Amino acid sequence: MSATPPIPSPGSSKPSSPRSASRNLGLNTRQASRPQIGARRDTNNGSESPAATAPIPDEDHGAELPLTMTASVILTGLPKDAHRALADVEAIDAGKVTVRFHPLPSAPILRNRVFKISASQKFETVVRFLRKKLDCSESDSVFCYVNSVFAPGLDESVGGLWRCFKTDDQLIVSYSMTPAFG
Protein backbone atom coordinates (compact mmCIF):
# COMPACT_ATOMS: atom_id res chain seq x y z
CA MET A 1 0.00 0.00 0.00
CA SER A 2 1.28 3.37 -0.89
CA ALA A 3 0.61 6.47 1.08
CA THR A 4 -0.92 9.37 -0.75
CA PRO A 5 0.93 12.64 -0.38
CA PRO A 6 -0.82 15.29 1.70
CA ILE A 7 -2.71 17.98 -0.21
CA PRO A 8 -1.09 21.38 0.28
CA SER A 9 -3.25 24.19 1.56
CA PRO A 10 -3.84 27.07 -0.84
CA GLY A 11 -1.90 29.55 1.27
CA SER A 12 1.18 27.44 1.90
CA SER A 13 4.26 27.91 -0.23
CA LYS A 14 6.00 24.84 1.14
CA PRO A 15 6.05 21.99 -1.40
CA SER A 16 4.32 18.77 -0.42
CA SER A 17 7.31 16.55 -1.17
CA PRO A 18 11.00 17.01 -1.93
CA ARG A 19 10.49 15.46 -5.34
CA SER A 20 7.85 18.03 -6.43
CA ALA A 21 10.09 20.81 -5.13
CA SER A 22 12.87 19.69 -7.42
CA ARG A 23 10.45 19.45 -10.31
CA ASN A 24 9.26 23.01 -9.79
CA LEU A 25 12.80 24.23 -9.40
CA GLY A 26 13.92 22.48 -12.56
CA LEU A 27 11.00 23.85 -14.52
CA ASN A 28 11.63 27.38 -13.38
CA THR A 29 15.31 27.21 -14.21
CA ARG A 30 14.58 25.78 -17.63
CA GLN A 31 12.08 28.53 -18.39
CA ALA A 32 14.49 31.22 -17.34
CA SER A 33 17.28 29.85 -19.50
CA ARG A 34 15.16 29.61 -22.66
CA PRO A 35 14.50 32.65 -24.81
CA GLN A 36 10.85 33.56 -25.27
CA ILE A 37 9.16 32.51 -28.48
CA GLY A 38 9.30 35.35 -30.94
CA ALA A 39 12.06 37.13 -29.02
CA ARG A 40 15.01 38.12 -31.12
CA ARG A 41 18.58 37.93 -29.88
CA ASP A 42 20.84 40.83 -30.50
CA THR A 43 23.46 39.61 -32.93
CA ASN A 44 26.23 41.66 -31.29
CA ASN A 45 26.17 40.43 -27.69
CA GLY A 46 23.59 37.56 -27.60
CA SER A 47 21.16 39.35 -25.27
CA GLU A 48 17.50 39.84 -26.03
CA SER A 49 16.53 43.13 -27.59
CA PRO A 50 13.63 44.93 -25.83
CA ALA A 51 12.25 46.07 -29.21
CA ALA A 52 12.01 42.45 -30.32
CA THR A 53 9.39 41.60 -27.69
CA ALA A 54 7.05 44.45 -28.67
CA PRO A 55 3.89 43.43 -30.57
CA ILE A 56 3.70 43.93 -34.31
CA PRO A 57 1.91 47.21 -35.01
CA ASP A 58 -1.26 47.17 -37.10
CA GLU A 59 -0.99 48.78 -40.49
CA ASP A 60 -3.43 51.46 -41.48
CA HIS A 61 -4.53 50.65 -45.02
CA GLY A 62 -6.18 54.00 -45.46
CA ALA A 63 -9.49 52.52 -46.67
CA GLU A 64 -12.47 54.60 -45.71
CA LEU A 65 -15.64 52.59 -45.23
CA PRO A 66 -18.32 52.62 -46.44
CA LEU A 67 -17.23 53.08 -50.02
CA THR A 68 -19.74 54.98 -52.08
CA MET A 69 -21.25 53.10 -54.99
CA THR A 70 -20.15 55.77 -57.47
CA ALA A 71 -16.53 55.19 -56.43
CA SER A 72 -16.82 51.42 -56.69
CA VAL A 73 -14.74 49.67 -59.30
CA ILE A 74 -17.22 46.80 -59.64
CA LEU A 75 -20.47 48.72 -60.11
CA THR A 76 -20.76 50.65 -63.34
CA GLY A 77 -23.98 52.37 -62.39
CA LEU A 78 -26.30 52.94 -59.51
CA PRO A 79 -29.32 50.67 -59.07
CA LYS A 80 -32.67 52.03 -60.14
CA ASP A 81 -34.94 53.68 -57.67
CA ALA A 82 -37.69 51.33 -56.46
CA HIS A 83 -40.47 53.54 -57.81
CA ARG A 84 -38.83 53.77 -61.21
CA ALA A 85 -38.30 50.00 -61.34
CA LEU A 86 -41.97 49.41 -60.51
CA ALA A 87 -42.99 51.91 -63.18
CA ASP A 88 -40.87 50.02 -65.73
CA VAL A 89 -42.59 46.75 -64.81
CA GLU A 90 -46.03 48.35 -65.08
CA ALA A 91 -45.10 49.81 -68.48
CA ILE A 92 -44.17 46.34 -69.76
CA ASP A 93 -47.44 44.89 -68.46
CA ALA A 94 -49.42 47.70 -70.13
CA GLY A 95 -48.31 46.63 -73.61
CA LYS A 96 -49.23 43.73 -75.85
CA VAL A 97 -47.44 40.39 -76.12
CA THR A 98 -47.20 38.25 -79.26
CA VAL A 99 -48.18 34.61 -78.69
CA ARG A 100 -47.38 31.94 -81.30
CA PHE A 101 -49.33 28.67 -81.00
CA HIS A 102 -47.46 25.56 -82.05
CA PRO A 103 -49.47 22.32 -82.43
CA LEU A 104 -47.98 19.11 -81.07
CA PRO A 105 -48.81 15.74 -82.71
CA SER A 106 -52.50 14.78 -82.59
CA ALA A 107 -53.57 18.43 -82.14
CA PRO A 108 -55.63 20.34 -84.72
CA ILE A 109 -53.75 23.07 -86.58
CA LEU A 110 -54.94 26.68 -86.40
CA ARG A 111 -55.18 28.73 -89.61
CA ASN A 112 -53.64 31.73 -87.94
CA ARG A 113 -51.01 30.82 -85.34
CA VAL A 114 -49.89 34.27 -84.15
CA PHE A 115 -52.04 36.43 -81.87
CA LYS A 116 -51.55 39.45 -79.61
CA ILE A 117 -52.74 39.59 -76.02
CA SER A 118 -52.41 42.12 -73.21
CA ALA A 119 -49.35 41.46 -71.04
CA SER A 120 -51.39 41.96 -67.87
CA GLN A 121 -53.66 38.97 -68.65
CA LYS A 122 -53.26 35.62 -66.93
CA PHE A 123 -52.25 32.45 -68.78
CA GLU A 124 -55.80 31.22 -68.12
CA THR A 125 -56.98 33.72 -70.75
CA VAL A 126 -54.61 32.20 -73.32
CA VAL A 127 -55.98 28.69 -72.62
CA ARG A 128 -59.60 29.88 -72.86
CA PHE A 129 -58.84 31.70 -76.14
CA LEU A 130 -57.16 28.58 -77.56
CA ARG A 131 -60.08 26.36 -76.53
CA LYS A 132 -62.44 28.77 -78.29
CA LYS A 133 -60.32 28.79 -81.49
CA LEU A 134 -60.14 24.97 -81.52
CA ASP A 135 -63.92 24.63 -80.97
CA CYS A 136 -63.39 22.35 -77.97
CA SER A 137 -66.35 21.02 -76.03
CA GLU A 138 -66.52 21.24 -72.24
CA SER A 139 -65.27 17.66 -71.87
CA ASP A 140 -62.22 18.10 -74.16
CA SER A 141 -58.83 18.75 -72.60
CA VAL A 142 -56.17 21.11 -73.94
CA PHE A 143 -52.62 20.88 -72.60
CA CYS A 144 -50.42 23.95 -73.08
CA TYR A 145 -46.64 24.14 -72.73
CA VAL A 146 -44.28 27.13 -72.97
CA ASN A 147 -41.41 26.42 -75.40
CA SER A 148 -42.37 22.71 -75.30
CA VAL A 149 -40.73 22.54 -71.88
CA PHE A 150 -43.18 23.20 -69.05
CA ALA A 151 -46.85 23.83 -68.36
CA PRO A 152 -47.24 27.17 -66.58
CA GLY A 153 -49.85 27.75 -63.92
CA LEU A 154 -53.12 29.30 -65.01
CA ASP A 155 -52.52 32.25 -62.70
CA GLU A 156 -49.14 33.15 -64.27
CA SER A 157 -48.91 36.57 -65.90
CA VAL A 158 -48.51 36.45 -69.69
CA GLY A 159 -46.16 39.45 -69.48
CA GLY A 160 -43.96 37.66 -66.94
CA LEU A 161 -43.83 34.50 -69.06
CA TRP A 162 -42.98 36.58 -72.13
CA ARG A 163 -40.18 38.47 -70.30
CA CYS A 164 -38.60 35.23 -69.05
CA PHE A 165 -39.20 32.78 -71.92
CA LYS A 166 -39.64 34.77 -75.12
CA THR A 167 -38.10 33.57 -78.37
CA ASP A 168 -37.72 36.19 -81.13
CA ASP A 169 -40.04 38.49 -79.12
CA GLN A 170 -42.80 35.87 -79.16
CA LEU A 171 -44.14 33.59 -76.45
CA ILE A 172 -44.21 30.11 -77.99
CA VAL A 173 -47.15 28.07 -76.63
CA SER A 174 -47.26 24.44 -77.74
CA TYR A 175 -50.62 22.72 -77.37
CA SER A 176 -51.96 19.19 -77.51
CA MET A 177 -55.23 17.37 -76.84
CA THR A 178 -53.42 14.67 -74.83
CA PRO A 179 -50.61 15.03 -72.27
CA ALA A 180 -47.43 15.39 -74.30
CA PHE A 181 -44.77 15.68 -71.59
CA GLY A 182 -44.47 13.83 -68.25
From Swiss-Prot:
Belongs to the ATG12 family. The keyword Transport applies. Pfam families: APG12. PANTHER family: AUTOPHAGY PROTEIN 12, UBIQUITIN-LIKE PROTEIN ATG12. InterPro entries: Atg12 (IPR007242), Ubiquitin-like_domsf (IPR029071). It is found in: Preautophagosomal structure membrane. This is Ubiquitin-like protein ATG12. There is a cross-link at residue 182 (Glycyl lysine isopeptide (Gly-Lys) (interchain with K-186 in ATG5)). The keyword Protein transport applies. Its main location: membrane. Keywords: Autophagy, Isopeptide bond, Membrane, Protein transport, Transport, Ubl conjugation pathway. Residues 1-63 are annotated as: Disordered. One of its GO terms (molecular function) is Atg8-family ligase activity. Ubiquitin-like protein involved in cytoplasm to vacuole transport (Cvt), autophagy vesicles formation, mitophagy, and nucleophagy. Conjugation with ATG5 through a ubiquitin-like conjugating system involving also ATG7 as an E1-like activating enzyme and ATG10 as an E2-like conjugating enzyme, is essential for its function. The ATG12-ATG5 conjugate functions as an E3-like enzyme which is required for lipidation of ATG8 and ATG8 association to the vesicle membranes. Residues 23-34 have a biased composition (Polar residues). It is a peripheral membrane protein. Residues 10-22 have a biased composition (Low complexity). Forms a conjugate with ATG5. GO terms for cellular component: Atg12-Atg5-Atg16 complex; autophagosome membrane; phagophore assembly site membrane. GO terms for biological process: autophagosome assembly; autophagosome maturation; autophagy of mitochondrion; glycophagy; piecemeal microautophagy of the nucleus; protein transport.
